[in-house]
């Protein structure tokens, strides 16, 4: 669920998904193409692949239970789809935290027209 994913990103990075990640590079936000431009964009690419493997796009709107305590995110019990989407979001938020030192403000609001080259494959 996008609102829950935003909260996970905020918990891990102390940055709001909008504006910092919603349009970052070639893969953060809706869709994605070409090569992942930076470590944070790779986190978004892997997140897109995870969503693709886990469930249909409709599952991305499922509300899932999770907890943030003692510096860690944990997914709670839910339907199979909710648990899969929660794990995709949790892993991506942790990846974004690990890539904070390589965050490039020049990739914020990156235009799709600059996303060139062959697309990554999952």
Curated annotation (Swiss-Prot):
Snake venom phospholipase A2 (PLA2) that may display neurotoxic and myotoxic activities. May induce inflammatory edema by mechanisms involving mast cell activation and arachidonic acid metabolites. May increase plasma creatine kinase activity. PLA2 catalyzes the calcium-dependent hydrolysis of the 2-acyl groups in 3-sn-phosphoglycerides. PANTHER family: PHOSPHOLIPASE A2 FAMILY MEMBER, PHOSPHOLIPASE A2, MEMBRANE ASSOCIATED. It comes from the Eukaryota. One of its GO terms (biological process) is phospholipid metabolic process. Belongs to the phospholipase A2 family. Group II subfamily. D49 sub-subfamily. This is Basic phospholipase A2 LmTX-II. Its EC number is 3.1.1.4. The keyword Oxidoreductase does not apply. Binds 1 Ca(2+) ion. It comes from Lachesis muta muta. Expressed by the venom gland. Keywords: Calcium, Disulfide bond, Hydrolase, Lipid degradation, Lipid metabolism, Metal-binding, Myotoxin, Neurotoxin, Presynaptic neurotoxin, Secreted, Toxin. The active site is at 47, 89. Ca(2+) binds at residues 27, 29, 31, 48. GO terms for cellular component: extracellular region. The lineage of its organism: Eukaryota, Metazoa, Chordata, Craniata, Vertebrata. It is found in: Secreted. It is an enzyme of class 3 (hydrolase). GO terms for molecular function: calcium ion binding; calcium-dependent phospholipase A2 activity; phospholipid binding; toxin activity. Disulfide bonds join 26-115, 28-44, 43-95, 49-122, 50-88, 75-86. Monomer. Its cofactor is Ca(2+). It catalyses: a 1,2-diacyl-sn-glycero-3-phosphocholine + H2O = a 1-acyl-sn-glycero-3-phosphocholine + a fatty acid + H(+).
């Amino acid at each position: 669920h996008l609102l829950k994913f935003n909260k996970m990103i905020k918990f891990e990075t102390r940055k709001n998904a909008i504006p910092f990640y919603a349009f970052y590079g070639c893969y953060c936000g809706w869709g994605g193409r070409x090569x992942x431009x930076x470590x944070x964009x790779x986190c978004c690419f892997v997140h897109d692949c995870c969503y693709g493997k886990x469930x249909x796009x409709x599952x991305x709107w499922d509300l899932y239970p999770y907890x943030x305590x003692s510096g860690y995110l944990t997914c709670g019990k839910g339907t199979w789809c909710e648990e899969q989407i929660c794990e995709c979001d949790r892993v991506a938020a942790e990846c974004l935290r690990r890539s904070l030192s390589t965050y490039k403000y020049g990739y914020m609001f990156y235009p799709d027209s600059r996303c060139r080259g062959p697309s990554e494959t999952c």
